[in-house]
UniProtKB/Swiss-Prot annotation:
This is Nucleoid occlusion factor SlmA. The lineage of its organism: Bacteria, Pseudomonadati, Pseudomonadota, Gammaproteobacteria, Pasteurellales. Gene3D superfamilies: Tetracycline Repressor, domain 2 (1.10.357.10). PROSITE patterns: HTH_TETR_1, HTH_TETR_2. Residues 30-90 form the HTH tetR-type domain. Required for nucleoid occlusion (NO) phenomenon, which prevents Z-ring formation and cell division over the nucleoid. Acts as a DNA-associated cell division inhibitor that binds simultaneously chromosomal DNA and FtsZ, and disrupts the assembly of FtsZ polymers. SlmA-DNA-binding sequences (SBS) are dispersed on non-Ter regions of the chromosome, preventing FtsZ polymerization at these regions. Residues 53-72 bind DNA. Its main location: cytoplasm. One of its GO terms (molecular function) is transcription cis-regulatory region binding. It is found in: Cytoplasm, Nucleoid. The gene is slmA.
Length: 218
């Protein structure tokens, strides 16, 4: 018996449907983080001291300027986000240091070391703290940085004032004056980093600098 073969003429051959893999879009939060990461990298680069334009930033991120403004309404908001990141990071590390160390002198030592290490490892953010990255930006950003240093100084004041309660010893100098000096030391080191284009590692000489501070705790 010969099997009848069906003719395929005039019949379309249907190829199996192949699903195109979907490319997951980044969330707004992820895009915002990407923009900030690229901005930090640009601030750290050789052109980090130049005026930061949205055109340059958009090109590095790989989006249009219009798309950039979907994630941040203005360049000022981008820098504000960076300053908030610096503030939250350093203050949380200070809090952690306070949990790990109870002796006031050691607390101050560890906190100063933490701050200088952060500045050394994050040149782009250090340029924000010194104001060099903000020279062509809105004046409110300089005020925001000043607010950060005020909060840092208050942290030092609180730690120093707790010494009398925790250790039964007071300072011969007003705690606010000492705190102001500690913040000035940090700001000076930040400026030194930027001035030398981060060639000098000031944290290597921190222990020598600490010798001038240590007598305050005697």
């Amino acid at each position: 018996m010969v099997e009848e073969q069906l003719s395929l003429s005039g019949v379309e051959e249907i190829a199996p449907k192949i699903e195109t893999p979907k490319i997951e879009k980044r969330t707004v939060k992820e895009r915002r983080q990407q923009v900030l990461t690229v901005l930090i990298h640009m601030l750290h680069s050789e052109r980090g001291m130049e005026r930061m334009t949205t055109a340059r930033l958009a090109k590095e991120v790989g989006v249009s300027e219009a798309a950039l403004y979907r994630y941040f309404p203005s360049k000022t908001k981008m820098f504000e986000a960076l300053i908030e990141h610096i503030e939250s990071t350093l203050l949380s590390r200070i809090t952690a240091s306070m949990r790990n160390e109870t002796q006031t002198m050691n607390r101050i030592h560890d906190i100063l070391q933490t701050i200088l290490d952060f500045a050394r490892k994050n040149p782009g953010l250090t340029r924000v703290l010194t104001g060099h990255a903000l020279m062509f930006e809105e004046a409110q950003l300089q005020a925001r940085v000043a607010q950060f240093f005020d909060r840092l100084e208050m942290q030092f004041v609180n730690i120093l004032q707790m010494r009398k309660l925790r250790e039964g010893r007071a300072f011969n100098v007003d705690e606010r004056i000492i705190a102001s000096h500690l913040v000035t030391l940090c700001e000076g080191q930040f400026m030194r980093y930027v001035r030398t284009n981060f060639r000098l590692n000031s944290s290597q000489s921190f222990e020598q600098q600490w010798r001038f501070i240590e007598p305050l705790f005697a």
